[in-house]
Amino acid sequence: MKRLIPAVVAALVFAVQGCASAQNETDMASIYDFKTLNNKGAEVNFKDFEGKVLLIVNTASKCGFTPQYDGLEALYQQYKDRGLVVIGFPCDQFAGQEPGSNEQIEEFCRLNHGVTFPLMAKADVNGPNAEPVFEFLKAQAPTEEYKGLKGKATRKMLKAISKSVEKDSDILWNFTKFLVSRDGTVVKRFAPVAEPADFAKDVEAML
């Protein structure tokens, strides 16, 4: 028994140090450390966006919030020459509202909403297979902003029906938006109910 105690203590110390190390890596990580794939299958390096203001959104084609594509594209057109990049990540984790292939999603967005901002490959945003950049975004901005009683009620409803939510920081639904400043800081997280026009001033303040 006495021989087991040092071994157990050593194992616990190692585990704690490992957790601390992993936490430090998360804290020290930059959004520019991440890579992903676009909807054509080509690698996208977030370092290429250094110095830009980013608005990163998980999207879906058959959602009640899908009309927000129009507002996101309008925001992109208004501010892209000043350094804004809107990045869409189609996601099928919420009620199966993004069932199409990457090609079908792109066609839908182009024909129905005139989308020209970059679309990434369809990805998970919660759970064990979540796109790593979303794990980073959620860690940096674990709570979302919403306005008024309507926003509060909508958030409560989405939290009740979303099956992919396991942690408080998890994304509740489609069209959650993360605003990232020019230096890579995750400044704000906007709820699905927040229309692009609602936070246009926040975007402009970053430019």
Label the model's feature ranges:
Residues 7-17:
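Bacterial N-terminal signal peptides
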Residues 1-4:
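Positively charged n-region of N-terminal signal peptides that target proteins for export
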Residues 52-53, 61-62, 66-90, 109-113:
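Conserved helix-turn-beta segment immediately C-terminal to the redox Cys motif
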Residues 114-193:
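Thiol/selenol-based redox catalytic cores and closely related redox-interacting motifs
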Residues 20-47, 67:
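N-terminal "domain-start" segment that seeds a small globular fold
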Residues 83-100, 116-127:
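Thiol-based oxidoreductase modules, predominantly thioredoxin-like and allied folds used
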Residues 187-207:
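Non-catalytic, surface beta->alpha helical segment in thiol-disulfide oxidoreductase systems
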